[in-house]
């Protein structure tokens, strides 16, 4: 199955990549809300590689695509409502040993989706996959 093809040698499969995006964006959205409601809260890191090996990483990707759609809808509502000063709010990331502002986080997660989409697009081209109409 194409979804179980690693996007690069030794890398995650397309399926794991989609589930990773949902996991990552769920965590980011919660961190975002914490920063909007608390003063520089310390967020909880997680081991994304271990999460990618949990049993839910074998589910059909539709579950994570639906999760991403829902999170992005909610996140969009928050972003649309934010004032300039809200983007200066921060959270502390213990693995990075620094605070991250919501403006930086917004750009980071917009990039994150595009970055992983590019992995899949390159795989499709490299493998010369075609999709019926």
List the predicted regions and their residue ranges.
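Short, contiguous alpha-helical
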Residues: 4-49, 73-76, 90-133
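Acidic/histidine-rich alpha-helical segments that form the ligand environment
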Residues: 31, 51-89, 109
């Amino acid at each position: 199955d194409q979804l179980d093809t690693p996007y690069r040698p030794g890398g995650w499969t397309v399926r794991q990549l989609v589930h990773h995006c949902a996991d990552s964006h769920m965590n980011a959205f919660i961190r975002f809300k914490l920063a909007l409601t608390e003063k520089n809260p310390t967020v909880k890191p997680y081991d994304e590689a271990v999460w990618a090996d949990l049993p839910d990483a074998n589910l059909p990707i539709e579950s994570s695509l639906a999760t991403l759609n829902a999170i992005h809808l909610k996140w969009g509502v928050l972003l649309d409502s934010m004032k300039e000063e809200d983007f200066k709010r921060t959270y502390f990331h213990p693995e990075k040993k620094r605070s991250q502002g919501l403006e930086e986080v917004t750009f980071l997660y917009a990039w994150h989706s595009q970055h992983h989409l590019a992995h899949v697009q390159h795989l499709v081209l490299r493998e010369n996959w075609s999709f019926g109409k």
